[in-house]
Structure formats: structure tokens, C-alpha cells
């Protein structure tokens, strides 16, 4: 099936009056100018959608006249070639009249109601950034500058390179704030690197934990899962919600919010007690088994049922089914890591793979078959490009602002956790902020972070739009080119590598790679190290080492071909010395083995086992558990709520899901307007209620990213950070929901 959408169709109904009624914050009038396009010849271009938090993801074929995109459709040769509503709406975003098209500088003091934005040239903006960053470096030290990437994730490699050669180890991103990296962190504590993955043709059973791929990844994940079910694979799903994925399960498990760790330990105990573990694998490749066996003893099926609400017989059946493998496991990127004990809860689930020997085996969960210099694209593409070795030096780790706040994260991760930014600004540890796609609403109690930015010596941000809640007290706001207007980055899809063929940016927008590289050349005086500000040359610095080039990949379009630098898949890489950097057999852990008992956690005064900690209990005044940040299939958090009216037509305001019993108890019906009340928020939070069995009784799920009086992040406390990851507790907050009048709320 081919999806094709024209510019005329997607912009229909989005005239000035309609758009003005939908956008929360209009950009300065400067941004309403448009760039004239020349030429009438029609041509075909290729790019990648950046609407999801998975990158690089789905391919887009577009047709343009001159420099105007007139129609988009599936890029059928691309590995991910189906577009969803978010991908289709990117064309509307491209020609949104509120786009930021020129660099803006504040002229009024910070804290003023009107920042006094004026248009300036790129030359002035770059000189201003270089002068201010170098002034902070000279007076306080390079580590007093925080470099940060939010969304899109695409500019992370050059921004990290910028931080490196500016000599600041304080580089963070939204994944080190509150996204998916905590689950990777949990796996690394036991396995040394990320492992959990989806089913393969030889998989007999797969366990999916807290992952609603039917909405988060409908075309890739869910289509593959349906195909696997059709061939007869057994499916275990552990999810607090009754999702479409859970509906497919042979054994659906629905624990109470925050009790996943108890469920995982209950399954571990069944494996041990019934002799379902792979003892030979454990003896050769694992450590800490005796401690695990001893701790698991208390998690009897009856105890687990009482604690989690999952029937004892289902706990036993799930453990037996998983043991009858080969089995794979898919762990959550978003949900469980945001519990109060999230990292340990993920770790407990992950140990099921090692206990049954389903580690990098045929049909089991696998490590990626990447060359050792390659890292997850959003951490820099290659260790060489970002000079990862420098970031990992002890003297650089000691300068990071997360050293005391999240010491385990500090030791394990190359990305800094910036969650203690308000405290670090007050203490003088951070004096300047360089933000690429930054969104201050990502944090709990965002007002604390807005105040922190206000008190900095200097700050700037790049973005597609002017966003007042983030940019109001910045010194500069820079216009970023969108996905149709960018060359970088190239895409890595398994062993395949894709290039792009873009249009020219509107106005004076620059792609983020060009911005970061140009700033790097300006602050260091070394243009060559930053490729003269050229994104394609930066890409070629990696692609040439891989035996290819950007031009070569462009010449292959529309085809996306294998890059031979990426090796063919192998199994049991741990036994062949293909994982460790010293080329010895084993894993990238301190012991060289899978660690049931984490030596790193113990080193920092935490239990070495992923112990279970009971979640906060609901109270009489706050009897409902809030799950904040759930997905919808047509919107990704805050990314598309004010920029693409087409998507707002699908859901124009915040909607919370509530079980019929809870709705009945409160006299609520479908579509009622409600207020959410939290002990941590000074104001109520507005929403509409959806009555559904998607939620179990006693919980409410809400979406993160709405603005104004729909902003859910104000209900999340800036305390109870996960001690293992430093992540906020977004999914264990107790609230109440009450019916609201249609009047304006009172604080």
C-alpha cells in the first residue's frame, strides 16, 4: 500500500484564523515571513521522519516543484517504509506560518514580560555565542557550560563533539533526563550493554514488558508481532494497562502500578525452585547466583499475588512458558524506568534471560552486531567521532554535575544527567546553557528549571518554533531546519545506511549539525576539526572509515543498501571475544560475566541485587495512581501538540483514561471535564476523561506535553529520584480526579 498526501490536502483548513486558534504560543511576527521559491520543474527527494522518539526511523519520499514540497508518500525502498499520521503531518509542520525562520536576540532584561526579540544575522549570533561561552570558560572553567540535546535527537553527535572540544564533560540529552536510556542502563549493570530484543524466526516464546508497540511503533513493532503470532509464537505480556499488545497474549499479566519488581522476582523464584534454569550457562557465564537464590526465596506465588494482584497460577505459568524456549524479551523504554524503583525493576525482569540461557542464542535475545567503534546513533554514531574515551576519563567524570546526584549513572554513562540543574545553577556549578531542541517542560516542576535558565549568565537554544515556556529567558533563539531540509544525519538501519536528498531550508534556517559545527569552529578556532561547518563532510568523516561516502549513498537512492563495514549477524558473541574491548571472551562488566549481583551498584552503597521496593501507597485524599507520559498513536509527547493542527484535530486537548468503576465512583461519564489534583502541585490540571478498561481500577493514565493548565509535569515532585539512574518518578504519583465546572479554574 502506498500513502500519498499533497501539500494542498494537508494544509487545507489551516488558514491564518484556524491556525491562530490552535497554537498555544505564536512565534514573533518575524517568523511569518516565507521564502520565495524559484523554478517549476518537479523532482523527487528523500528524507527521514523525526516525529517519533525512535531515530532514525521511517523514510519519506517527497515530490517538490522548485524548492517547494508538494506531495509526500511512503519511501517504499526504505527498511521502515510506512507513514503514520505523525509522518504525514510533518508536511504541515514544514509550512506552518509560525515557524522560526531567523536568529532572534533578546533586548530586554531577563524576567521581563516582553523579551524584546529582534532579528539578527547568523554572523552576529555565532560571534555572540562564541564570546559568551569562552568568557564563561575563561572565568569559571569549561565544565560550567551545559550542552544539551532534546528533540529531535538527530544533532546529538555534533553537539557532543562540540562539548568535547570545548572541553566540557557536561553534555546531556532528553534520554539522560527521562526517556529510554534508564532501561539500557539497567541492562548494562548486569550484561555490560543493551541486549533485550524482539523475536526472530526461531523464537518460541517472547515476553513483552510495559511496551505498547501497537501505538508507539505501529508499523514496525506491531506488524512484526502480528506476523510472529500468526506462525504460532507464545506471548507473555506484563503491562499495567490492557493494551492491544496485551490482548494478543497467551498469558497476560497486569500487575498493580509500581509492583513489577515483585512479579519479576516471583518468576525468578519459580525458575529456581522448579529447576528450570540453565545451570551450565549460569556456572560458566554468570556471577552472584547464590545471592539471587537466597533473595528470591520470599517471593512465593502467594506473596506475589497479594503484592501485585497477578494470580499465583499465572506467575507460575508465565515462568514455565518462558523457560520452554528459546525465548526473547522486550523491555520497556519509557514506562517502568519512571517508577520509583524503576531501574531495579527492569534489571529484575532482565535476569530472566540469563537464568534460562536465552542470551545471544538462536531464538533468544541478542546483542547488536555492531562494530566496536559504533555506538547507538543518538550517543554519537562512533566513539571516534565524539572521542568517547575523553568523556570516560576519571578527571572528566569528576567535573560532571551528576557526580553526587547520580553516582552510578555518572560512572556508567557517557551522557551527563542534568536533572539537578536548578541546584547546580544555584551553587554556581553551571553558568551557561547551550540547548538544541530543548524543552523545559520535560522536567518535573518545570518552573524550577525555568528559574534556573533565568539565572544563568548566558543561554541559547535552537528550535523549529519559538516556545515561550522554554525560550522566554534565553539570550538567543536560533532557527533550525526541519527533516525535509537536512542532509545530516545519515540513517543506520541494521546493516543498511541511507542518505537524504533535501530541499533548501526556508528563511535563514540552518540544520542543527551546521549550527553545532559552526559554533565549534568559532569557540575553538579550529575550523578543520569541525569540517568547516559542513554537515556532509562531518558525515563523510565516519562514512569514509566505513568504506562508503555520503555521495555514494545518495547515488543509490531510492535504494537503501547494506554497508559492508557492518558485519553479518553472529550468535554467542560473548564466547568469541566479540563484545569486550580487550577481545577476550565474556561481557563488558567489571567481572567479565553477567552480574546478577551488580558490583557497580554495591560499590556505590546500593544493594547489588535488583531488590524490590514497595511503591507509594494511595491515600484517602489521593487514591489514584497517575501514570504520566503514556503514548497515543498519533502524537508523541509535546512534539506535535502546537505545531501540526492536523494532529490536534484528532485530539485537541488533554484526555486521561480512567476505569469505569473509578469514573462511576466520582459521578463521571465519557467526555466530562475534570481536574487532576496532586499534593505536589499548587494548581489543578485540566483534562477530559475517557472511560475505558484500558486502565485497571485505581489508576489514571495521562499524556505528558500539554501546556498551560493541562501541563501534567507540575504534579510530579522533584524528589524520589531513582538512585540507580537519577530518573524522575513519573509513574508512581498519587492523585485525585474531580469533576470540574466549565468555569475558569481557581488555583
Q: For the regions a protein language model found, what residue spans apply to each?
A:
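N-terminal export/assembly segments and adjacent metallocofactor-ligating motifs
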Residues: 2-276, 298, 311-312, 519, ...
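N-terminal leader/propeptide and maturation segments of large enzyme subunits in energy/redox metabolism
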Residues: 106-122, 276-311, 503-585, 650, ...
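Extended redox/cofactor-interaction regions of prokaryotic respiratory oxidoreductases
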Residues: 157-238, 261-265, 351-473, 481-489, ...
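Short acidic (Asp/Glu) and glycine-rich catalytic loops that position anionic groups and cofactors
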Residues: 243-248, 295-300, 326-332, 429-430, ...
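Short beta-alpha connecting loops at secondary-structure transitions
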Residues: 250-254, 479, 495-506
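Long, contiguous, secondary-structure-rich segments that constitute the structural scaffold
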Residues: 512-563, 641-657, 661-747
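Acidic/polar loop patches that form or flank catalytic/metal-binding clefts of enzymes
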Residues: 278-279, 315, 329-330, 358-368, ...
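Conserved short loop/turn motifs at secondary-structure junctions
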Residues: 145-153, 306-310, 333-340, 372-373, ...
